[in-house]
């Protein structure tokens, strides 16, 4: 059983990093670092929390794949990633998670981004 769990975690980790390749460079960098930190942070959690963690990352990977496919079919050439987070979902977050979410939002919306991204750049998948 533990071997299967490790394989599942590794496969999901690689899948998420691979999906990040369709993101603009600054968001890819931010997302990759966040994924690495989160997977490292959850390495020693209990079985129940590990299952919830994997389920949420699988939902994220599925949503990102869907958005990447929609962006690829979009004729305007402008990629759009992300989703609305309803208040009910926010109420389920712990204080630590709210803090992480705020940090991510601040990083993702910084006006002085590290890279210059062309609007016409369409990610390849």
UniProtKB/Swiss-Prot annotation:
Q: Name one GO cellular component term.
A: mitochondrial intermembrane space
Compartments, as annotated in UniProt:
Mitochondrion matrix
The residue span given for the transit peptide is 1-30
Single GO biological process annotation from the record = mitochondrial respiratory chain complex II assembly
Alphabetical list of InterPro entries matching this protein: SDHAF3/Sdh7
Key words, A-Z = Chaperone, Mitochondrion, Transit peptide
Q: Report whether Mitochondrion shows up as a keyword of the record.
A: yes
| Principal place of residence | mitochondrion
The question of whether Lipoprotein is a record keyword is answered with no
Q: Write out the function statement from the record.
A: Plays an essential role in the assembly of succinate dehydrogenase (SDH), an enzyme complex (also referred to as respiratory complex II) that is a component of both the tricarboxylic acid (TCA) cycle and the mitochondrial electron transport chain, and which couples the oxidation of succinate to fumarate with the reduction of ubiquinone (coenzyme Q) to ubiquinol. Promotes maturation of the iron-sulfur protein subunit SDHB of the SDH catalytic dimer, protecting it from the deleterious effects of oxidants. May act together with SDHAF1.
Tell me its family.
Belongs to the complex I LYR family. SDHAF3 subfamily.
Subunit structure of this chain's protein: Interacts with SDHB within an SDHA-SDHB subcomplex.
Protein name, UniProt field: Succinate dehydrogenase assembly factor 3, mitochondrial
The source organism is Homo sapiens (Human)
